[in-house]
Amino acid sequence: MADAADLRPAAANANFRSSRHAPQRFQTLHFRGTAMTQPTVVIKYGGHAMDKPELSEAFATDLAHLAGQGMRLVVVHGGGPQISALLTRLQIESRFVDGLRVTDEATMRAVEMVLCGQVNKAVVSAFARHGARAAGISGRDGGLLRARPKNPALGLVGEVTAVDPALPRCLLEAGFVPVVAPVASGPDGEALNINADTAAGALAGALAAEYFVLISDVPGVLNADGRLIPGLNRAEITRLKEDGVISGGMIPKVEACLNALDAGCSRALILDGRAQSSLRRYLLDDAPLGTVIVR
């Protein structure tokens, strides 16, 4: 398709900036109403920010406010706890390999039911209650996300190979907030389960978003002493992974940020979704929150 974005990594930028300068670099580009006209912001939404009622309501309020300020918002949501709950009721065992859910055909049916039905529509409804015009879609709609099986041991878990952003672009132009469930179409049209961080980063790159914000349950990337690192580049991320400081669930988050930057996104951030109005404070008030990822 003409609008499809190839996800093959671009050449790395050799001119790394020191992480201690990253927040200042990004603050000068923050949205100012007139300084940046209708910036596109792709948000990975999940964790406590989505599961805890008081945080989810606050997030919906902030999202509606940001949309009212002229930001073009795209939300990609997770739904792991809800999937596990349904599988338990169906007496299907939940198994994970390296943090990824092993997905056979029965599990995939449950995944698609929960993500595209239950969770997607609940998120859309929450946003609508607070005045945001949201439209729920999945990665299979309009050929948005295409993928191939990631690893035979994982079953129907996919890695994204291409993104066609035509559908979310149409929704954005019409004034809607696209809310995307991370399910993709495989080579034979089969449904594939996609890590939500990965899907969101791929979409941010394909849309050439000004911001990719990954909402997490931690303040950002932490150093070996448990203190927040305000900014990181690719070389520093590689070193911290080798040292075991970046591990587990943080690995796909930083990789999603780097992939988004490689594919055309301007800036990426891992942000604490447990902090009240963290997204709004970062985008509108230049609050020094989270970890900024640069190439």
Task: Tell where the protein language model's regions lie, with residue ranges.
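Nucleotide/pyrophosphate-binding catalytic subdomain
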Residues: 3, 8, 13, 17-20, ...
